[in-house]
Amino acid sequence: MIRGMLPRGLRALRPSVSPTVVSSSLHRNFHSSIRRFDEKIPETYEEEKVIIDEINQSLTEKDLASSSRLRNIGVSAHIDSGKTTFTERVLYYTGRIKAIHEVRGRDAVGAKMDHMELEREKGITIQSAATYCSWDKDDKNYHFNLIDTPGHIDFTIEVERALRVLDGAVLVVCAVSGVQSQTVTVDRQMRRYNVPRVTFINKMDRMGADPFRAIEQINLKLKTPAAAIQVPIGAESELKGVVNIIDRVALYNEGAQGEEIRAAEVPAELADLVEEKRALLIETLADVDEEIADLYLEGQEPTVPQIKAAIRRATIGRKFTPVLMGSALANKGVQPVLDAVVDYLPQPNEILNTGLDISTGVEKRTNLIPSSTAPFVGLAFKLEEGKYGQLTYIRVYQGKLKKGSYMNHIKSGKKVKVSRLVRMHSNDMEDVDEVGAGEICATFGIDCASGDTFIGHNSEQQIAMSSMFVPEAVISLSISPKSKDNGQFSKAMNRFQKEDPTFRVKYDPESKETIISGMGELHLEIYVERMKREYGVECITGKPQVSYREAITAPTTFDYTHKKQSGGSGQYGRVMGEMTPLEGENKFSQHIVGGKIPEKFLFACSKGFEDSLEKGPLIGHRVLGVHMHINDGQTHVVDSSELSFRTATHGAFRQAFLNAKPVILEPIMSVEVSAPNEFQGSVVGLINKLGGMILETVNGQDEFTVTAECSLNTMFGFSTSLRACTQGKGEFSLEFCKYSQCAPQLQRELIAEHEKKQKK
């Protein structure tokens, strides 16, 4: 079953898992244990739609009217594609801000959604920022809950947590660079959470802009049927507006900030292009929508309402993305995107959200009802330290949340009072008395973790929702405060871990060092800098360390006995079975005949397996891709205990692992480098020098882009080397790609270094 096709509440969970098989990633990423479902889970939007229609029949007219005016959307893209600039225009045109400020503007104010000092200094988005605004269309007022997300891969958890709670998204693509590495990553994240999207091709005013090449890349690289619903009027510096090819209307942005839209006839020189792209749009829709397909086969041209209805059906059904174009920086083409959000992205009651009813002790999938009269269910998806304490962002899926009311934390069972309820506008907040189903809000003073579920205080159903996907850290470094006062240092570490699940902290008893791990060098650099600015703690950091993995390449059997006698009752446990290599996550299973190992001891065996995964036998790094199966064993009537079998499993794991031709895996990164054409030889030479494998080279009018795979171990200091060989004009992005077996020489060096540390 494709993970991306699961209903929203269960989308990252795996159905029909045997209770004797443990996948380590489930325990790591989600709060609850393995789920087991007997119900058939919808695999397509058509199947979901049947359930959605049944739910909507139970909603009141007030609920339906409220939902129809609401859109929960995110803005996502590759770094430097113009997300925050686009969002700034959205806020200005919807009246939420009175003036436009640029991301790297000279006024030292910065974009509204980049409220952190570090974001404004570096010109990048580090944290997702939420706001809400209103937009008028066809004499109706619509409310948008909008989240601007980072484009840098190091802050990917911000994209994950935003997409987890949003109903739709605007995917921003650069008209010059087209689909880039992080565009592919964002597309994968949108599929993971079943998020429909409209696409905005930005930077149409730049030299080399080619929107139709970008659309072709969306079709080929993202494997998403896409077609333009606009064509540009003019190109590059001569960009004047866009033509809506559905209605055959030209739209010009006028006024000092492009705030006025003037509709006019299609320019004569664009008439043929408009008809060509309109025919292509209808042809593409015929491939994904039955109604248009029938008209197409009968030779009939669909009407404008039929085309718009088909685009909406196909977009919400995740079969198609309509493509708009313009330039946010030049204030052109942004307002039509807001119209497209209303026309083509779903309202809350058009998305199937599900949870797990755990009231009876047996987990059962339940559909959430976007009604304000139903019992409250909400998901805490983001935490921030505010001036009034911890700020918790909550998406309300069912019922309503009132100021002064109580709700229950599903994980701890604690009753929590909602003392203050706010709507966020970046770092500003506006108090509200209540929020209804489908809305996003924030509250203070709640002790919880990101991804926790809350329900109404008097709710009969105990409903839990799945958390967001949390990727593994790929880089680590040692850290210690310069001063001996560890109070603020510990406080910062605890807070950052709570806010960001990809930021990990552990104490290494061997080196007696605190180790922080994250998604990349920039990720960790930002936290070190934040400790200095927000807590006054200057830190000393060690050299970045790669997060290797240990794996096996051959199957083997094991027969291990743990025996310990020290007077009185001792310890005894014997386990037998086999260990085999496995693609992907680790797995533990057992099949014991005749009760040779009691159930409670088998549970201890699974715990012993989990313990063993944390520190592999070769160099003490996590283990990946191992299946351990226990099929026999032996107990002692007096000396056997859970500890005995946990220890026996740990010993058997080590014994078998070392006999199974173990190897060390290193993280391989997908690298994308862009630079002026005259530096192509230097960049290719640099990548070859690092032992990278070049996958693709795309030559543009002025710039080229190289995509390659390189070992993370060789990438430290790459930014300095790239600046040197491109005179500071080169840019690059890094994204984790896969784990691959490292060179034998490096493996020997790593093992020798680990053994040397062990002897100290």
From Swiss-Prot:
It is found in: Mitochondrion. One of its GO terms (cellular component) is mitochondrion. The keyword Acetylation does not apply. Its main location: mitochondrion. Residues 1-37 form a transit peptide. Residues 68-349 form the tr-type G domain. The keyword Cytoplasm does not apply. GO terms for molecular function: GTP binding; GTPase activity; translation elongation factor activity. Keywords: Elongation factor, GTP-binding, Mitochondrion, Nucleotide-binding, Protein biosynthesis, Transit peptide. GTP binds at residues 77-84, 148-152, 202-205. InterPro entries: EFG_II, EFG_III, EFG_III/V, EFG_IV, EFG_V-like, EFTu-like_2, P-loop_NTPase, Ribosomal_Su5_D2-typ_SF. GO terms for biological process: mitochondrial translational elongation. Pathway: Protein biosynthesis; polypeptide chain elongation. It holds the Pfam family GTP_EFTU. Mitochondrial GTPase that catalyzes the GTP-dependent ribosomal translocation step during translation elongation. During this step, the ribosome changes from the pre-translocational (PRE) to the post-translocational (POST) state as the newly formed A-site-bound peptidyl-tRNA and P-site-bound deacylated tRNA move to the P and E sites, respectively. Catalyzes the coordinated movement of the two tRNA molecules, the mRNA and conformational changes in the ribosome. This is Elongation factor G, mitochondrial. It comes from Meyerozyma guilliermondii (strain ATCC 6260 / CBS 566 / DSM 6381 / JCM 1539 / NBRC 10279 / NRRL Y-324).
